[in-house]
Amino acid sequence: MSKHRLFHIAFGLIIVLGMNGCLKEGSETIVYLGYENYIPPIEDVIPQELLKVYSDSIGEIPRGYIPPNVEGSFVINPKHRMLSNNLISWPLEVIEPDLTFSISNQHNGVIVNLNFSEATTTPSDSVYIMGHDEYFTIYYREIKEFVDEGFTTVVTRGMILTGEIHQEGIRNLRYADIIIDVYDDSNGLIVQYPAGQYFIYKDGDELSNRL
């Protein structure tokens, strides 16, 4: 066999082996290794102000490249207010309505489907997850639309959800958001929280049960 042909065979084997080494198989999908590098760090999605408040008041958020599987449906009941930088307009003693949410199609640091019972809320970009063992952090940006008296207000928020996943549900759930941008076509007639306002919630009994 000629050296020229041996070279082409060897080159072909290198290409095939290289391609196999670049693939990682999940439960239902195959993605390229290094895909995690395309997942933005939480600091690029969530404003530093909320991250600092979260760290100071709750503790460091769970991090890691191998988060637990958190697929399922859950209910925050009772939904308690924990902390805000606007306690005059947002008193902590108010108990809010229960909040249900569902998570599905989780793959390699991305959650394809995240749905809340608040129908006006829609993620505006990908939903990301990181963590280790049973500890996880979900983070993303969302757009929430309010319609009142014929006027529309559109709020862009940064969202964080952390907790510990267990068979019975999510323990020690914390759920926070910060307003990043506000569009208001009422010329100030409809007053909403301004950009920079943040709000942190928890499940009052420290367990968000599976549904």
Model-based region annotation:
Residues S104-R171:
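Contiguous, well-ordered beta-strand patches that form the walls/edges
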Residues M1-A10:
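Bacterial N-terminal signal peptides that target proteins for export
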Residues I76, H80-S124:
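N-terminal glycine/threonine-rich, aromatic-flanked beta-hairpin/loop signature
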Residues L23-W90, K202-L211:
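Amphipathic/hydrophobic helical signal segments and adjacent flexible N-terminal regions
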Residues L17-G21:
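C-terminal motif of bacterial Sec signal peptides marking the signal peptidase cleavage site
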Residues V75-L83, Y139-V147, G158, Y175-Y183:
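Generic short beta-strand segments
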